[in-house]
Design a protein with these regions (language model features):
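A short beta-loop-alpha structural element at the N-terminal edge
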Residues: 9-24
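Conserved GNAT-fold acetyl-CoA-binding loop/helix
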Residues: 24-51
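A short helix-loop-beta-strand connector motif used in the catalytic cores of GNAT acetyltransferases and
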Residues: 50-60, 69
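Conserved beta-strand in the GNAT
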Residues: 66-74, 81-86
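Conserved beta-strand-loop-alpha-helix junction that forms the acyl-donor binding cleft
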Residues: 89-92, 117-127, 143-150
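Conserved acetyl-CoA-binding loop-helix of GNAT-fold acetyltransferases
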Residues: 93-106, 128-132
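Conserved GNAT acetyl-CoA-binding A-motif
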Residues: 108-120
């Protein structure tokens, strides 16, 4: 069931105390897809979250005080990278992802920099959703697809689907 009302989400900076929750959420949502393309390496995954938290590039998404996902992006000199958007399984399909990515799209627009992301080709639900909200495929090696947000696309608005 899709929620059509906008949820009152909050975003806060991830801190070192969030590392285990970030890792667990990533593992629950992404392990199967990652293992289809790469070897799942828990040490590498944990190290990646520790680095993103140290750099201040990861935000926890909360709704009614409950952690329901996280979004990780990096601003580079000529673009914005959406490194990861992850919503806990029981909170998916409630527009949380749509609102979280809208925050990053707004940042990209304000900075006048294109928004890029990588999506695993085997993660068809994510791939299809990114296409639906206006991302275009610019590179695909059969395992990982690089996509860019095309703000001129007629479908380049975030609907209530994520």
């Amino acid at each position: 069931m899709h929620c059509t009302a906008v949820m009152d989400l909050s975003f806060r900076q991830a801190i070192s105390g969030d590392l285990e929750w970030l890792f667990d959420t990533d593992k629950r949502t992404m392990r199967v897809a990652v293992a289809q393309v790469y070897v799942w390496d828990e040490d590498s995954q944990r190290a990646g979250f520790a680095k993103s938290v140290r750099q201040g590039a990861c935000q926890i998404v909360t709704w009614e005080g409950k952690q329901c996902g996280f979004v990780h992006w990096e601003v580079e000199p000529d673009l914005v990278w959406l490194r990861m958007l992850c919503i806990v399984p029981d909170m998916q399909h409630k527009s949380i992802g749509s609102q979280a990515i809208a925050k990053v799209m707004s940042l990209s627009s304000r900075l006048k920099k294109p928004l890029y992301l990588h999506v695993l080709v085997c993660n068809r639900a994510a791939y299809d959703w990114y296409r639906k909200i206006g991302f275009v495929e610019i590179e695909n090696d059969g395992r990982v697809c690089t996509m860019m947000f095309d703000s001129s696309s007629p479908s380049g608005t975030v609907g209530q689907h994520g």
